[in-house]
């Protein structure tokens, strides 16, 4: 039996990864991390989506220590979220140092216990917003380290790594789930489900990606298929 663990926040990217994983694996588990994020609604959104989409299990893991160690606008009310115009150059205030190092390592431990062969994460280098822990070389390096430390072959799978946001929307549409991803996920830094606030950097990427897909759906879908091998 092919099993996978999806690092699941309830946002656009991880939900799209979950949708695809459910079509590719016999059993899919979700792990969501409670790290003291400002908008707790994302945990509730993740719970609901995991159940609705049919994940075998959904585990919420306490990662509160990250909040104590890493200062970020995602965890501190007194730090302002960046707008899109503020996101160019340098690390944005939304960067949480060590977040993906911790999340992927904990997800790998869970995968070890349930005998999963893959940990799936929605990180993307094309739209990575300056986060160093979303880069392909980082994911591969951590994957190698985890495999050495656990003496077991586990794959860190990144379906969105080389896709832009338009192609990520196309991927959701490929599985006939675009409307669910649009209306039921929470990506907005200001904690607004669906189309979000429209002002933060996350909403800008999401909104402009959807507009780009809708403007040229056939071309974007063809690009997606060329990159991923989907038919």
Swiss-Prot record:
Which GO molecular function annotation, any one, does this entry have?
Answer: zinc ion binding
| Pathway listed | Purine metabolism; 7-cyano-7-deazaguanine biosynthesis
Which Gene3D superfamilies does the entry mention?
Answer: HUPs
- Report disulfide bridges, numbered on this chain: none
Q: Which Pfam families match?
A: QueC
In which organism is this protein found? Sodalis glossinidius (strain morsitans)
Reaction equation(s) it catalyzes: 7-carboxy-7-deazaguanine + NH4(+) + ATP = 7-cyano-7-deazaguanine + ADP + phosphate + H2O + H(+)
Report keywords, A-Z. Answer: ATP-binding, Ligase, Metal-binding, Nucleotide-binding, Queuosine biosynthesis, Zinc
The record, for SUPFAM superfamilies, names: Adenine nucleotide alpha hydrolases-like
This entry's comment on the bound cofactor is: Binds 1 zinc ion per subunit.
What does this chain do? Catalyzes the ATP-dependent conversion of 7-carboxy-7-deazaguanine (CDG) to 7-cyano-7-deazaguanine (preQ(0)).
The identity of this protein, by name, is 7-cyano-7-deazaguanine synthase
- Tell me one GO biological process term: queuosine biosynthetic process
Family listed? Belongs to the QueC family.
């Amino acid at each position: 039996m092919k099993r996978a663990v999806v690092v699941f926040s309830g946002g656009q990217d991880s939900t799209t990864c979950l949708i695809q994983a459910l079509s590719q694996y016999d059993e899919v588990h979700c792990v969501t991390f409670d790290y003291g994020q400002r908008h707790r609604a994302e945990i509730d959104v993740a719970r609901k989506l995991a159940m609705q989409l049919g994940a075998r299990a959904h585990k919420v893991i306490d990662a509160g220590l990250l909040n104590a160690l890493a200062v970020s606008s995602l965890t501190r009310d007194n730090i302002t979220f960046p707008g899109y115009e503020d996101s160019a150059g340098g690390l944005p205030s939304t960067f949480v140092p060590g977040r993906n190092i911790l999340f992927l390592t904990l997800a790998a431990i869970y995968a070890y216990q349930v005998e999963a062969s893959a940990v799936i994460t929605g990180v993307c280098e094309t739209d990575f917003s300056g986060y160093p822990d979303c880069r392909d070389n980082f994911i591969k390096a951590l994957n190698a380290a985890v495999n050495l430390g656990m003496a077991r072959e586990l794959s860190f799978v990144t379906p969105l790594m080389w896709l832009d946001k338009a192609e990520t929307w196309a991927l959701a549409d490929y599985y006939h789930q675009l409307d669910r991803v649009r209306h039921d996920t929470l990506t907005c830094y200001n904690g607004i489900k669906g189309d979000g606030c429209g002002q933060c950097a996350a909403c800008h990427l999401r909104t402009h990606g959807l507009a780009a897909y809708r403007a040229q759906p056939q071309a974007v879908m063809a690009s997606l298929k060329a990159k991923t091998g989907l038919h």
